[in-house]
């Protein structure tokens, strides 16, 4: 008999869409700094992510870069050992969005 754990379960298209919608709503109209300072609002409670306060990021490129690196480490798809299917999918989506928004943030700073 084969037994499956919660981590082995695949998400349905409906479950994926619900997570996608949450990520879109969370990211909507936010710049990169606001995304980093609000990541705790969407990430699961027992993740390795530590809250980053907005006032620590404003005009502080070192803190912004550090927050980005910590977020990508916490969300990296290969680092989701023991996470549920929902957490893995959410991590993958957030990882992608944060990478995209970081690229936009860097391009705007270069102008």
Model-derived regions: residue spans:
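Eukaryotic long, low-complexity intrinsically disordered regulatory regions enriched in serine/proline
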Residues: 1-10
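N-terminal J-domain/J-like co-chaperone modules of DnaJ/Hsp40 proteins
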Residues: 9-111
């Amino acid at each position: 008999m084969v037994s499956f754990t919660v981590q082995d379960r695949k998400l349905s298209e409906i479950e994926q869409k619900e997570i996608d919608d949450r990520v879109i709503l969370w990211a909507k109209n936010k710049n990169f700094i606001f995304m980093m300072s609000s990541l705790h609002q969407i990430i699961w409670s027992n993740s390795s992510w530590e809250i980053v306060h907005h006032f620590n990021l404003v005009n502080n490129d070192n803190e912004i870069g550090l927050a980005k690196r910590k977020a990508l480490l916490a969300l990296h798809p290969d680092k989701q050992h023991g996470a549920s299917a929902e957490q893995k999918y959410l991590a993958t989506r957030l990882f992608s969005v944060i990478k995209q928004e970081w690229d936009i943030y860097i391009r705007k700073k270069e102008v």
